[in-house]
């Protein structure tokens, strides 16, 4: 029976409709994320907080604010961002390697993956509560920031903790919905949206500087070329892969005979993707932020020294950041690609690699 051309058109049309729905869902979710980043925690003076963030330019707090899409500078319910979830993911994935019970759960396939995801949610809740308590108790005690909290007390602490924890758990749920109903990894998309939220104002400010003559046009052109070149290089590396030739011998199943086939096993150059950089940022941000919040308290002056050493650009920060990225590159690649498991699967399917 001849294949009708109209069927291909209907199939393609249905595929485009599904893609459109997924894109619209992602756009809608990001709009909700941006709206939520403007909903403030009750009881905080936004003008005093803006002065605080102005004093913290170039510090770890500004970096934390960037990851939250500016939510921290507005004392938003999304101020914690998605970082507690990332930290919990790191802890759970490390435990799956060193803890035999979790290692067995991981081998259970889809059911095991759901259990691991559930454990990650519990870990996110615990870390979010811990971090929100730290922020709620640290804000009223920050030196030189009198009036930041209008009415400090139990009511403010309770409201702030509930708001921050709820915001983080909602972002985690939103990221999972984007992964399921949208396109790509939802958590990565939320992080990306938070980072690029400050891009349009920065571009507009740069163009205005060039228009007024404060910035030379050739320098602006050079920056644009560098941005394009870096983007091209990142995409080139991300799409790069090593193709291992895999052959299937002639085989018979029942009455059907399958001819010998040759295909390839694609191994990405960068299997870990951007995950190591995100994990490394999360690992450094957590202690540095705690040190920055509590460093001004009595008896906690040593935390101020720690926070200064962990500022972006400091030698210790660069060393720890680079070391963490290298570690998570190896660690995450070992998680997503198991050579022994891949070899067993190839053997079970009757495939072999020539010369091995």
UniProtKB/Swiss-Prot annotation:
It is found in: Cell membrane. PROSITE patterns: SECY_1, SECY_2. Its main location: membrane. GO terms for biological process: protein transport. The chain crosses the membrane at residues 24-44, 77-97, 125-145, 154-174, 183-203, 217-237, 274-294, 317-337. SUPFAM superfamilies: Preprotein translocase SecY subunit. It is a multi-pass membrane protein. It holds the Pfam family SecY. Keywords: Cell membrane, Membrane, Protein transport, Translocation, Transmembrane, Transmembrane helix, Transport. One of its GO terms (cellular component) is plasma membrane. InterPro entries: SecY, SecY/SEC61-alpha, SecY_CS, SecY_dom_sf. Belongs to the SecY/SEC61-alpha family. PANTHER family: SECY/SEC61-ALPHA FAMILY MEMBER. Component of the Sec protein translocase complex. Heterotrimer consisting of SecY, SecE and SecG subunits. The heterotrimers can form oligomers, although 1 heterotrimer is thought to be able to translocate proteins. Interacts with the ribosome. Interacts with SecDF, and other proteins may be involved. Interacts with SecA. The central subunit of the protein translocation channel SecYEG. Consists of two halves formed by TMs 1-5 and 6-10. These two domains form a lateral gate at the front which open onto the bilayer between TMs 2 and 7, and are clamped together by SecE at the back. The channel is closed by both a pore ring composed of hydrophobic SecY resides and a short helix (helix 2A) on the extracellular side of the membrane which forms a plug. The plug probably moves laterally to allow the channel to open. The ring and the pore may move independently. This is Protein translocase subunit SecY. It comes from Buchnera aphidicola subsp. Acyrthosiphon kondoi (Acyrthosiphon kondoi symbiotic bacterium). The gene is secY.
